[in-house]
A protein has these predicted regions:
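Glycine-rich ThDP/TPP pyrophosphate-binding loop and its adjacent helix/strand module
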Residues: 1-85
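Conserved acidic/glycine
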Residues: 48-144
């Protein structure tokens, strides 16, 4: 199965590459796109969904990657991490959406714990993705 996680506002080239690869793959393909919607309560407004997607990727909330099994046939690592190391503030990203910001008003004592856990989980995912992307760069010795 070909799998990609994309965000149009974050990297249009990565999105187009993923769609092209997904279409070319001779089997099922799954492309998961980050799509801000009105229920997110983007404080900048719905006219800023592309910018919000970029913020999600820059903060490490959403990671961009592609998994193309065809690369394995070429002796290459099938997993490609397209996201850079997160550089923006994770909590600042969360607070830019009403769905998260409202939690600080309704359950302030729990909100901070949940935000910290969400950030830790996102960082763990990124580290796992980095490890997967590095796997193909290490030569593997064939057993005799």
């Amino acid at each position: 199965v070909y799998v990609a996680q994309v965000g149009m506002g974050a990297d249009k080239n990565q999105l187009m590459k993923a769609l092209k690869e997904a279409e070319a793959y001779k089997g099922p393909s799954l492309v998961i796109a980050y799509a801000p919607c009105i229920a997110h309560g983007i404080q900048a407004g719905m006219g800023k969904t592309q910018e919000q997607t970029k913020k999600a990727v820059d903060a490490g909330y959403w990671h961009l990657y592609r998994y193309n099994p065809d690369l394995e046939l070429e002796g290459k690592n099938p997993f490609i991490l397209d996201s850079k190391e997160p550089k923006a503030d994770f909590k600042e990203y969360l607070m830019s959406e009403v769905r998260y910001a409202s939690l600080t008003k309704t359950f302030p004592e729990v909100a901070e714990q949940l935000f910290e856990k969400a950030e830790m989980d996102a960082k763990k995912r990124y580290e796992i993705y980095k490890q997967l992307a590095e796997m193909g760069k290490q030569p593997v010795k064939a057993e005799a």
